[in-house]
């Protein structure tokens, strides 16, 4: 199993208070062919961290946004993961599941009925694999895992198990305890971006939870949520001590291109309108996302990781970042796989 692990970074020293472990996996579409291949890939990164003595009962491992969403091709024919584009990958899925797809399509109320119907008809299988893999990994390594995010309809965590429901699709992140159970609360993305809005519903910022972990009180802000002051106000009100930001941004070379402003919702009042087009994408993340806003929540430690890989035509080159006691740190955008360890 090739991890494409180009970078391992350690910040601080072990003070027996635990650590935030940012895992930036380099995923291939074939990694989603089965539950076993998905498990093996993520297991490889955790095993690499264990070999560096970076895992302990107070470790919180953080994985990127949409990591679980591509389980939509789970169990499908090789055409799905061998396709050159995401649209072509979806075609054999629709053909093989024609009846449930049509049923979902007829009842869909989303603007993008096709995307919504595909994810909704595969939701049970996706949720089961997501739960099984991260539960098993949390137990195997005895750590807390922020399982990136996954698209599911009306999801909930019942008895430590993630279950899809009937209703709108949400982009959610689950936190798995060292005993393998999912925390009863889910972090639901409050600010889907423009490309998500046609089929992904918005959560409420006021419902964002904080998770009790052995390393401290953890807040999880899914990608674009980290750009909005309301999210940090919620974290402050719940006395968060750590913040994790699972992210995914599409576009090769995007990080160094001019920033296109806020997407999917109005820019907050504290944003300089002139920054759109003046800042690069990377500079905007530095100024307006985790690194620029975490202090407003009274939080000193945070990590932001992005999904990298060869996933059809969904190319991404973005830089993971860490905040440690008010000091920010960026990794190179050229990195494929990376482990970023922040001792608390």
Regions found by a protein language model. Give the residues of each.
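N-terminal glycine-/serine-/threonine-rich phosphate-binding loop
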Residues: 2-53
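Cys-nucleophile CN-hydrolase/nitrilase-fold catalytic domain and related Cys-dependent amidase chemistry
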Residues: 47-177
């Amino acid at each position: 199993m090739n991890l494409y692990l180009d970078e391992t970074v350690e910040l601080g020293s072990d003070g027996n208070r635990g650590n935030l472990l940012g895992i930036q996996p380099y995923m291939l579409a074939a990694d989603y062919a089965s539950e076993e291949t998905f498990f093996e890939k993520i297991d490889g990164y955790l095993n690499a961290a264990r070999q560096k003595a970076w895992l302990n009962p107070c470790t919180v491992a953080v994985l990127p946004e949409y990591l679980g969403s591509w389980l939509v091709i789970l169990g499908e024919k090789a055409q799905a993961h061998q396709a050159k584009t995401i649209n072509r990958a979806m075609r054999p899925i629709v053909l093989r599941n024609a009846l449930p797809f049509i049923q979902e399509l007829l009842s869909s109320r989303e603007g993008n009925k096709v995307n919504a119907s595909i994810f909704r008809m595969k939701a049970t299988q996706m949720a089961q694999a997501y739960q099984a893999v991260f539960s098993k990994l949390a137990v195997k390594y005895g750590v807390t895992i922020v399982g990136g995010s996954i698209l599911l309809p009306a999801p909930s965590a019942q008895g430590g198990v993630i279950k899809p429901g009937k209703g709108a699709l949400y982009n959610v992140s689950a936190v798995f305890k060292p005993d393998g159970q999912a925390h009863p609360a889910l972090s639901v993305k409050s600010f889907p971006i423009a490309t998500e809005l046609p089929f992904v519903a918005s959560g409420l910022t006021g419902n964002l939870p904080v998770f009790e972990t052995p390393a401290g009180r953890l807040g999880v802000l899914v990608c674009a949520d980290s750009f909005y002051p309301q999210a940090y106000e919620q974290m402050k009100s719940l006395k968060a001590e750590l913040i994790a930001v699972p992210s995914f941004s599409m576009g090769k070379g995007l990080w160094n291109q001019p920033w296109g402003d806020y997407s999917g919702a109005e820019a907050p009042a504290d944003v300089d309108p002139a920054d759109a087009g003046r800042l690069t994408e990377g500079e905007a993340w530095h100024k307006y996302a985790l690194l620029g806003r975490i202090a407003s929540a009274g939080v000193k430690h945070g990590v932001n990781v992005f999904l990298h890989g060869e996933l059809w035509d969904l190319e991404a080159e973005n830089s993971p970042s860490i905040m440690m006691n008010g000091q920010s740190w960026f990794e190179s955008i050229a990195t494929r796989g990376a482990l970023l360890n922040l001792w608390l």
